[in-house]
Design a protein with these regions (language model features):
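Intracellular juxtamembrane helix-capping segments at the cytosolic ends
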Residues: 62-75
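Structural signature of the two symmetry-related core transmembrane helices
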Residues: 24-39, 119
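Multi-pass alpha-helical transporter architecture, strongest
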Residues: 119-145
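A late C-terminal transmembrane helix in Major Facilitator Superfamily
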Residues: 79-107
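Helix-to-loop junctions at the C-terminal end of transmembrane segments
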Residues: 8-22, 106
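Paired small-residue
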Residues: 36, 47-55
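A membrane-interface helix-boundary motif in multi-pass transporters
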Residues: 104-123
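Helix-breaking motifs and short loop linkers at transmembrane-helix boundaries and internal kinks
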Residues: 21, 42-44
Length: 145
């Protein structure tokens, strides 16, 4: 269910971004991941676990595709290969590093606590998205920052 949640929305995430804007889709991703955290607090029975994993996957998809979409606006055409390769390498290297510690963290803190630790990161993401939205709405104010 989690993997389906991660990749199945890719068929329509681009359309959602085109229709509603990348920042709104990314905010939806933050909301879905927050829903995932709240769902984990209801228990580890199968329905809670399954719905939580779907929310996690779709939220990840909206943020990942949204972030990749934003990345394409930050470099010149001549920098495309290097920028995308650096982005992919960073994502996969961080994922690899986190994979090595995941079991120990789960054993030490437990499922619900690990998910709760996601909340500050989601708050940072929401603030960053809001800041970017403000910069896009008020370009002159952004120049003064």
């Amino acid at each position: 269910l989690h993997v389906l949640g991660m990749f199945l929305p890719s068929f329509f995430t681009g359309s959602l971004i085109a229709r509603y804007g990348v920042l709104r889709v990314m905010f939806a991703g933050v909301a879905l991941l927050t829903g995932h955290v709240l769902m984990t607090l209801t228990g580890t029975e199968f329905p809670s676990f399954a719905l939580g994993l779907v929310l996690l996957g779709v939220g990840w998809n909206f943020l990942y595709i949204g972030g990749t979409t934003l990345l394409t606006t930050t470099y010149r055409s001549s920098e495309k290969g290097r920028a995308q390769a650096t982005n992919d390498m960073t994502i996969f290297a961080v994922g690899l590093a986190c994979s090595f510690g995941a079991g120990a963290l789960l054993q030490t803190f437990g499922w619900q606590t690990l998910n709760m630790l996601l909340l500050p990161w989601l708050a940072v993401a929401a603030l960053a998205i809001a800041w970017l939205g403000r910069r896009r709405q008020h370009p002159q104010a952004a120049l003064a920052d």
